[in-house]
Amino acid sequence: TASFGVNWDDISADQFAEEGTVTVNGTADVLGDEIPVSATIRVQTEQITVGSSVSGKVMNLTQSIPEGEQSDTLSAIVDGSTTISDNTSGGANPTAWSNWQSSQNGNSKAEITFEYATQQRLGQIVMHFAKDSGSMRYPDAGTTEILVSEDGTNWNKLAVTETIGEESGRVKPYTYDFTPTTATFIKFKLTNASASTGTGWKPCTALTEIELKVAQGSF
């Protein structure tokens, strides 16, 4: 069999903006003769489903709080467990991260950053916030910001829809839905609850897990 080069007519992205069939015309040089040819392209909308969490595959997990003011266990938010222990033995709670010490020092904000070895395509994020009888309080609605980056320097804020779930075992899920996006770095900007705790302690924020769920596409 022989193959011949084809010169295709110019096409624009607008021709593929809607589902359907697009015909592209061109000409092939067949042994010196210009032969008209055409190709039919089927255009479909990608169907997105939300897959499993890739939080546990994070390469670097960091927080903005200086080492001397860090509280509880940062790695707990990627261990796959959303529950919080009573931690009756004292010391750092191994099942949650918090900004307790930093908050008591007067800082109401904190950041947590995920860095991956390769780009991730995300479709949903679920943050599991925790509460206790002392300082831990659920954040106010609409105060958590999520930013994404490919290089860790230039950041874009995600436009999200926040849904606050029901409390179970002192943990409440905050689900963030958004248009599927790619990122190598994901940053969370956290702000403590505004209301007083009524306990003498300043409010702080605690997390048992952050689920970064992949977006899976199919046609």
Range-by-range predicted roles:
Residues 1, 19-20, 79, 169:
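Solvent-exposed, conformationally flexible loop/turn segments
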Residues 2-43:
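Serine/threonine-rich, repeat-prone extracellular segments and beta-strand-based repeat modules
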Residues 4, 28-30, 41, 78, ...:
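Short stretches within intrinsically disordered, low-complexity N-terminal or propeptide regions
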Residues 12-19, 46-51, 68-71, 96, ...:
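Short, surface-exposed linear segments at secondary-structure transitions and domain or protein termini
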Residues 42-49, 215-217:
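Extracellular interdomain linker/stem segments of modular secreted and single-pass surface proteins
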Residues 47-91:
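Predominantly extracellular/luminal regions of secreted and cell-surface proteins
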Residues 91-154, 170-219:
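Aromatic, loop-rich ligand-recognition surfaces of beta-strand-rich domains
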Residues 157-166:
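Solvent-exposed serine/threonine-rich low-complexity stretches and specific carbohydrate-binding patches
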